[in-house]
Each structure stands twice: as C-alpha cells, then as structure tokens.
Amino acid sequence: MTTLRIATRKSPLALWQSEHVAAALRQHHPGLEVVLVPMSTRGDEMLDRSLAAIGGKGLFLKELELAMLRGEADCAVHSLKDVPMELDAPFVLPAILERGDPADALVSNLYASLQALPLGARVGTSSLRRQAQLRAARPDLELIDLRGNVNTRLAKLDNGGYDAIVLACAGLQRLGLEARISARLDAPEWLPAPAQGAVAVECRGDDARIYSLLAVLDAGRTRACVEAERAMNRALHGSCHVPVAAFARWEGQGLFLQGMVGSASDGRLIHADAHGSAEDTEALGRRVAQGLFDKGAAQLLAEL
C-alpha cells in the first residue's frame, strides 16, 4: 500500500480543497492511501495586518514547503492565486485542477448589488485589487481591511461591522455557502486575481514518483489560462502589494487575456488585452503586460 501525505492549511476552505484533491487521487489510483497533514501558516496566524504589510501570500506556502523538505509531507495543495509567481527550487506544480468560478462575490445582508449600496457604505476587503475596482465603481465607499478565513469574514459581516464584503465566488461555493452571494462581480467589467478559482498541487521536482502520481490531475485548458495570467503578473513584477488583475479564456483554438493594473487609493484603472496562442502563454502574458506599460502602468505602479 502506497501512502501519499498532503500538507494543507487548517482553514475549512483549504481542507475542502485538499480533500477534493485526495478524492481525485484515490479515484485515479485505486489502492493509494491519501492522508492530510493539516498545518498552520504565518499567513493564517497574522490576521491583524494586511497581507501586503506582512510579506505577501507566500506566507501561506512556506511552512508547507518546509514540511516537504523535512520529509513530513509529499505534496501540498494551494489556491493558485496564493502561490508566488516564481517557486523556490526544487518545487514545481505537477497538477493544476480544472478551474472553479473565477469571479468575485459581493456579500451583503441588506443590499443586492454594488450599485444598491448607500453612499459611504462600509465594505470589507484587504485585497488591493478589489479595493482599486471598488474605488473606480464607487468612490464614495468606505473600504475597510478584512482578514481571516471565509467563515470568519462572514461572521464579521453578520455582526454588523460592514454593509458588504467582497469574497471569491469559488470559496463560497466550495463551502456550500453560494446562497450568501448577493451579486457576482465578473469579467469583463470586473477582473479577478490571476489564477483565481484554480487549485494547484505542489511537490518536489526531484521526486519523480510523487510527480507522476499527481500529474494525472492536471487540466491542460485551465493550466493554459492561468499560466497566461501569471505570466502577465510576472512581467509586471506583481504581488499582493500591487493591484493587478488578469483573466484568460479560450476563444476557438487560442486564448484571450484581459489584464488590469489599478490604484487602491484613487480608483484609477488601466486595462489591456490580447489574443494569443495557448502554446506560448508566456508571450501572451508579456504582450498584455507591455500593453499596460504602454498606457502608463509603470508610473501608476511606481506611486504605490
């Protein structure tokens, strides 16, 4: 009996995603025993400050990667939007699963849409990307930092601290909370984080046995889209310090990639898009990034 150990964060959403991967692996590999190794990460523990202030989304990975290096786990499951653009050696992503809903969700107990929010409404989100698009759509809103897992954020809304909050649709759907979605915020008017809605499995690239076990879960069409989005972000030197959005979709045999850079302070948004080959997602990402630079993205990013 072969056993595969999956390192995972302890949040309900992370555990759901890891169990989803585990179930798929058991289906593909009858006889494979898959166990979860839940771990706490610095990103989960430091909830009093924004991610940008404490070092970025890579904080969600480091402890899981250390567990793999120490031989305590064979792989780790992540929301791909939390994975840095460049992985440290020897880590690789053998599997990116079929993408879930990439859109954002406005969640409110009183108001059915972004437009329905009253003047000066209090909206919770710590994402600079979401803040920039909220400021562009509704400059009057009071935007307030909001950290914690999905259930924690919903509890803060329900306790009256906010008129609305913005979360990822995929997270709510995976936790059976789709009924909490008041309005979808989606492309082309509203762009998600690069790779939002996609789950990735990480392992050591020097472990061929584990790599081959995981690679059967890879969804090629999803990988092409999210690699184009991440290539654009990489070309912009983006991180959670920077309000960057990207969304790629298949059109015929190729991809259509939309990108955005914004200002969370005043709501200025710069958009660019391009069609390209799914065989060269890096080139497509760089082309959209260059389109953003041509429209003044470098100056906007320099102000952050």
Swiss-Prot record:
Key word Ribosomal protein present: no
Domain of life: Bacteria
Cofactor: dipyrromethane
Biological pathway: Porphyrin-containing compound metabolism; protoporphyrin-IX biosynthesis; coproporphyrinogen-III from 5-aminolevulinate: step 2/4
GO CC field: cytoplasm
GO biological process: protoporphyrinogen IX biosynthetic process
InterPro entries: HemC, Porphobilin_deaminase_cofac_BS, Porphobilin_deaminase_N, Porphobilinogen_deaminase_C, Porphobilinogen_deaminase_C_sf
UniProt key word Cell membrane: no
Substrates-to-products reaction catalysed: 4 porphobilinogen + H2O = hydroxymethylbilane + 4 NH4(+)
Residues with PTM S-(dipyrrolylmethanemethyl)cysteine: C240
EC number(s) from the headed UniProt entry: 2.5.1.61
Keywords per UniProt: Porphyrin biosynthesis, Transferase
Biological role stated in the UniProt entry: Tetrapolymerization of the monopyrrole PBG into the hydroxymethylbilane pre-uroporphyrinogen in several discrete steps.
Misc remark: The porphobilinogen subunits are added to the dipyrromethane group.
HAMAP family found in the cross-reference section: Porphobil_deam
The name this protein goes by in its record: Porphobilinogen deaminase
Gene: hemC
